[in-house]
């Protein structure tokens, strides 16, 4: 069973439909799941507050080797903190912080390419430079070698190259929304389901 963590925000139906999972905020269901999906939209601090009662269950699942997929804000929550909510710690699964885009139009909304930097089972059968759908104002700056995909965001004469996918052991996360990314997104979710 795949547990799609319900934090009371965002439309989780498309993620659940693509994965055949169960939408839940029950710690026992999350603990008993074979895989966990941590989706998210909204404010880093507000969502971390809702996630706090599940922190231990999620960290234990990761330490037990269960595959976890973070989506959009779910990727950001896996880092140590965010400029969006100073002083509010993230899950700290990955070292590094989340910063706001500077010099480019915010938010970054629309289709953009993901360039694969390392092999990762999430991207099996997906062409390098494939397009995915993004909606975000912040991005992660990892302080360790976990980046498996990057994206170039150009606007207003400026360019930011940011980490759009990370992977280490059984923890995977993407800044884009695979559930809104057509065939490429469905393939990525299927790859996660088959891990």
UniProtKB/Swiss-Prot annotation:
It comes from Thermococcus kodakarensis (strain ATCC BAA-918 / JCM 12380 / KOD1). Its main location: cytoplasm. GO terms for cellular component: cytoplasm. IGPS catalyzes the conversion of PRFAR and glutamine to IGP, AICAR and glutamate. The HisH subunit catalyzes the hydrolysis of glutamine to glutamate and ammonia as part of the synthesis of IGP and AICAR. The resulting ammonia molecule is channeled to the active site of HisF. GO terms for molecular function: glutaminase activity; imidazoleglycerol-phosphate synthase activity; lyase activity. This is Imidazole glycerol phosphate synthase subunit HisH. Residues 1-195 form the Glutamine amidotransferase type-1 domain. Heterodimer of HisH and HisF. The active site is at residues 72, 177, 179. Its EC number is 4.3.2.10, 3.5.1.2. GO terms for biological process: L-histidine biosynthetic process. It comes from the Archaea. Keywords: Amino-acid biosynthesis, Cytoplasm, Glutamine amidotransferase, Histidine biosynthesis, Hydrolase, Lyase.
